[in-house]
Amino acid sequence: MIKVYNRITNEYEEENVAGKKFIKWTYETPVGKSITELIAKRKIFSKFYGKFCDTKCSAKKIPDFVRDFNIDMNIAEKNISEFNSFNDFFVRNLTSTSRPIDYNEDIFISPGDGRITVYDNIDLDNIVQVKGLTYSLRELIKNDEISERYKDGICIILRLCPTDYHRFHFVDSGIPCETHKIKGHYYSVNPIALNSIPKLFCENKREWCIFKSENFGDVLTVEVGATCVGSIIQTYEPNKKAKKGDEKGYFKFGGSTTILFLEKDKVKIDDDILEQSKQGYECKVLLGETIGTKVL
């Protein structure tokens, strides 16, 4: 059971996991683990399934998916019948009023919808993946010089499951640099997998860039692919000013993760998120939601 903290109701909710039985089988049984290592983590598997999700035939899956996971289509720009494929639905745009952005320059917002975990005063060589498993920032981005800038800073992990809005956005106005791409595997980023695969974020395909924000210093943004994520698509223009809330990119089909690293003494994360993170619980958040404030 995966329990997630609801910041509005102050209660814990059980996450309805897409493909839960399959995920548990692939990451918690000997046969499943063997299949994962031989097939599921490979690019060809995710590429093949991603291609299927681009076909018109895959659109037949949409109504059942919406019903089974109670997805609110009232906030989507298109009706179910208007999507040409499952990927078209998966990367759906939302209405302009569904995710309000607080443009107060002191407010630090969530870059997308998902489940958030935050660690502060991070040790660059022992960043927590889950309790008992760690990784280093150097391994994650393969750049020692940039990694050092985030010593004792903050690590924000936003996990997206297949039912979520899968576009990610800029947390402030500023200048995004070029994207750096690192090849890797395609393990699931579900907590079941995170508890089973050491240094999972460093094993998977990922992309990163430095975002020179106007109010929160240089934000290191990392997008991590996952099983069946055919592509990480960057839609922003490098070295051109972006506004707070502007789209940075999106993930095609599959669960996926965005990780932000903040320099020391730039942002104070909200107390409830820090407390739940210490207890091992993710907090459910939406794009544009306040998750911290500027350190003055």
UniProtKB/Swiss-Prot annotation:
Substrates-to-products reaction catalysed: a 1,2-diacyl-sn-glycero-3-phospho-L-serine + H(+) = a 1,2-diacyl-sn-glycero-3-phosphoethanolamine + CO2
Chief place of localization: membrane
Signal peptide region: none
Sites annotated Cleavage (non-hydrolytic): 255-256
PTM: Is synthesized initially as an inactive proenzyme. Formation of the active enzyme involves a self-maturation process in which the active site pyruvoyl group is generated from an internal serine residue via an autocatalytic post-translational modification. Two non-identical subunits are generated from the proenzyme in this reaction, and the pyruvate is formed at the N-terminus of the alpha chain, which is derived from the carboxyl end of the proenzyme.
Cofactor note: Binds 1 pyruvoyl group covalently per subunit.
MF terms (GO), sorted A to Z: phosphatidylserine decarboxylase activity
Cellular component, GO, one term: plasma membrane
Quaternary assembly: Heterodimer of a large membrane-associated beta subunit and a small pyruvoyl-containing alpha subunit.
Family named by the database record: Belongs to the phosphatidylserine decarboxylase family. PSD-B subfamily. Prokaryotic type II sub-subfamily.
Name of this protein: Phosphatidylserine decarboxylase proenzyme
Native organism: Clostridium botulinum (strain Eklund 17B / Type B)
Lineage: Bacteria, Bacillati, Bacillota, Clostridia, Eubacteriales
